[in-house]
């Protein structure tokens, strides 16, 4: 089977592994052509693209960009271009979809840095230890807010500008943006204050962008998973404490359960839904410690 020239196109950030790869595969299975963004996981992204292209030729590409550090992030593509600003790097991701397929119908803002920044721990700049592998809380702030809030804002802006510019040619096209928020905006994990702040900003962006972009028939929604496919370095004690608080099944959400909601929000069945955030957390956000 080959990709139809009219197949809808989805840009998924952080698509190389874990939840992002599951979302990308689910969209591909629904007939989407996918642009797989990655930061450091080049091998994983290439493997996923090869798998998807084997199923349907010319249905997946990979594009690398650092969306996390506002001040120093880099960007590389095969042509060697190096846009400097975060907005230009975000625009380049959207442009890649148009260069390859002439359209971009869906944007999934999934890329995310995630680690604790305890308020009572001294960072390196205060004579204490570093925050994760970061040298200071200032760098952590640029990283966490860059990937979780600022880059999504710029990606939405670039996406919407392209829609506005091509509206006449793409008349009748349905557009959808899905922001991957977090159930922690309702009940934070201890020590993850800065991450929670950034995800709160993303949830606010979801509502504000939905209002502003409705005139272009761009729907903007959020999905708030609980802990799903976890990073390798998350302490087991944190995972166990989380699962203990989940009313439904006392477990993490699966990648497939989260991806199913993303697919729904991108589908015609959700054509009258915008500005909402759906929790996929087994009721975690309803509980208190």
From Swiss-Prot:
Keyword Cell membrane: no
Alphabetical list of SUPFAM superfamilies matching this protein: NAD(P)-binding Rossmann-fold domains
Record: residues binding NADP(+): 14-41, 195-199
Alphabetical keyword list: Methotrexate resistance, NADP, Oxidoreductase
EC number(s) on file: 1.5.1.33
InterPro entries: NAD(P)-bd_dom_sf (IPR036291), Pteridine_reductase (IPR014058), Sc_DH/Rdtase_CS (IPR020904), SDR_fam (IPR002347)
Gene Ontology BP terms: response to methotrexate; tetrahydrobiopterin biosynthetic process
Subunit field text: Homotetramer.
Top EC class for this record: oxidoreductase
Protein role: Exhibits a NADPH-dependent biopterin reductase activity. Has good activity with folate and significant activity with dihydrofolate and dihydrobiopterin, but not with quinonoid dihydrobiopterin. Confers resistance to methotrexate (MTX).
Active site: 195 (proton acceptor)
Name of the protein: Pteridine reductase 1
Pathway the protein contributes to: Cofactor biosynthesis; tetrahydrobiopterin biosynthesis; tetrahydrobiopterin from biopterin: step 1/1
Binding positions (substrate): 176
Presence of keyword Oxidoreductase: yes
Similarity annotation: Belongs to the short-chain dehydrogenases/reductases (SDR) family.
GO molecular function, one term: pteridine reductase activity
Catalytic activity: (6R)-L-erythro-5,6,7,8-tetrahydrobiopterin + 2 NADP(+) = L-erythro-biopterin + 2 NADPH + 2 H(+)
């Amino acid at each position: 089977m080959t990709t139809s020239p009219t197949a809808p196109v989805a840009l998924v950030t952080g698509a190389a592994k874990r939840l992002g790869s599951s979302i990308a595969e689910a969209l591909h299975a629904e007939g989407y052509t996918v642009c797989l963004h990655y930061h450091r996981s080049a091998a994983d992204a290439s493997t996923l693209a090869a798998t998807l292209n084997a199923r349907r030729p010319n249905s997946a590409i990979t594009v690398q960009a650092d969306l996390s550090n506002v001040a120093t992030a880099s960007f590389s593509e095969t042509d060697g271009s190096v846009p400097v600003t975060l907005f230009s790097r975000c625009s380049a991701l959207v442009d890649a979809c148009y260069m390859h397929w002439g359209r971009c119908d869906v944007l999934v803002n999934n890329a995310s840095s995630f680690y604790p920044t305890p308020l009572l721990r001294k960072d390196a700049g205060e004579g204490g230890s570093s925050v994760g592998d970061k040298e200071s809380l200032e760098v952590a702030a640029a990283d966490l807010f860059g990937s979780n809030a600022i880059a999504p804002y710029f990606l939405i802006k670039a996406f919407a500008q392209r829609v506005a510019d091509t509206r006449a040619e793409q008349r009748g096209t349905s557009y959808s943006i899905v922001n991957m928020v977090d159930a922690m905006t309702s009940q934070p994990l201890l020590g993850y204050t800065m991450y929670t702040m950034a995800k709160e900003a993303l949830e606010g962006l979801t509502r504000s962008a939905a209002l502003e972009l409705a005139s272009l028939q761009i729907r903007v929604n959020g999905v708030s998973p609980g802990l799903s496919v976890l990073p390798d370095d998350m302490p087991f004690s944190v995972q166990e404490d989380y699962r203990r608080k989940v009313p439904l099944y006392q477990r993490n959400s699966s990648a497939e359960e989260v991806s199913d909601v993303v697919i729904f929000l991108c589908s015609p069945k959700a054509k009258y839904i915008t500005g909402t955030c759906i929790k996929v957390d087994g009721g975690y956000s309803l509980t208190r410690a």
